[in-house]
Amino acid sequence: MEVKISTFLQIAVLIVLGIHLIAAGQDTDGKEKSDEYELFTVEYCGTNCTQLENGSWTACTGKNGTCRCFHENDKKVGLCLSTEYTDFSEYPDPNSEEIKAASPLP
């Protein structure tokens, strides 16, 4: 009985989290010219970091060294996260002549 309740609660939390993420993803309407071609991603590296006695933090490993420790002000435990910013405005328009010329011919 205890396992069924725990499983039910986990599924309910995942459903609520999924709905929350979907709603948050639809927050932009695409009218903002500057945000249209920008993407900021955050991924959990699968580990946590802790503050040592000397005040330093344990190293975050994984994701080819792109993981960093993020923590709240007075907490002793943080999350190892990998962040990446991509600005697609640096790339040419997919319909430009340069892209069409570089496309393979049939």
From Swiss-Prot:
It is found in: Secreted. One of its GO terms (cellular component) is extracellular region. Residues 1-24 form the signal peptide. The keyword Disulfide bond applies. GO terms for molecular function: C-X-C chemokine binding. Its main location: secreted. Glycans are attached at N48, N54, N64. Disulfide bonds join C45-C67, C49-C69, C60-C80. Keywords: Disulfide bond, Glycoprotein, Secreted, Signal. Salivary chemokine-binding protein which binds to host chemokines CXCL1, CXCL2 and CXCL8. This is Evasin P1168.
